[in-house]
From Swiss-Prot:
Chain's gene name: NCBP2
Keywords in alphabetical order: Cytoplasm, mRNA processing, mRNA splicing, mRNA transport, Nonsense-mediated mRNA decay, Nucleus, RNA-binding, RNA-mediated gene silencing, Translation regulation, Transport
GO biological process, any: regulation of translation
Subunit description: Component of the nuclear cap-binding complex (CBC), a heterodimer composed of NCBP1/CBP80 and NCBP2/CBP20 that interacts with m7GpppG-capped RNA.
Domain RRM as annotated: residue spans: 43-121
Family: Belongs to the RRM NCBP2 family.
Protein name: Nuclear cap-binding protein subunit 2
Taxonomic classification: Eukaryota, Metazoa, Chordata, Craniata, Vertebrata
Subcellular location: Nucleus; Cytoplasm
Binding sites annotated in the UniProt record for mRNA: 23, 46, 115-119, 126-130, 136-137
GO cellular component terms attached to this protein's record: cytoplasm; nuclear cap binding complex; nucleus
Length: 168
């Protein structure tokens, strides 16, 4: 077996995909140790960088390839109640969630590379974006529109592709 292929395949079999990231939910009620313990036994994943147009059905179809999905909670803008680019996927077992971390993290859905991370477990209210404008905090630091997320960027890109003048 070639060196590169062997390295790639052994990487898929490693536990590095299932390690807990450095991110910690600042709204978690409890100590850092309790949060870390919760993350290590959790069967819930945070899924970020979703298109605003990605549907729950698309999430179900993709994530069910790794096991039985218990529920999906789509992230919503807390003011407009529209999708804002993230969701929570809860599996029945930790093993199925680990498969999703290993095989789905970094894949493309709706022309966007999605990222997954462990979540200590969904609690009511967490489905709403935490940014001041209702969406995600991360979106508030963007300097221009994200084409994959919709808004004027999507319209302008389509007009450029069709060589039509943009009207604002």
């Amino acid at each position: 077996m070639s060196g590169l292929l062997h390295t790639t395949l052994s990487g898929l079999n490693s536990d590095s995909y299932c390690e807990i990231s450095q991110y910690r939910d600042q709204h978690f009620r409890g100590s850092r140790q309790l949060q870390e313990k919760s993350l290590k036994i959790s069967s819930t994943l945070y899924v970020g960088n979703l298109s605003f147009y990605t549907t729950e059905e698309q999430i179900q179809e993709l994530f069910s390839k790794c096991g039985d999905v218990k529920r999906i909670v789509m992230g919503l803008d807390k003011i407009k109640k529209t999708p804002c680019g993230f969701c929570f996927v809860e599996y029945y077992t930790r093993a199925d969630a680990e498969h999703a971390m290993r095989f789905i993290n970094g894949t493309r859905l709706d022309d966007r590379i999605i990222r997954t991370d462990w979540d200590a477990g969904f609690k009511e209210g967490r489905q709403y974006g935490r940014g001041k404008t209702g969406g995600q905090v991360r979106d508030e630091y963007r300097t221009d529109y994200d084409v994959g997320r919709g808004g004027f960027g999507k319209i302008i890109q389509m007009q450029k592709a069709n060589h039509q003048p943009a009207i604002y």
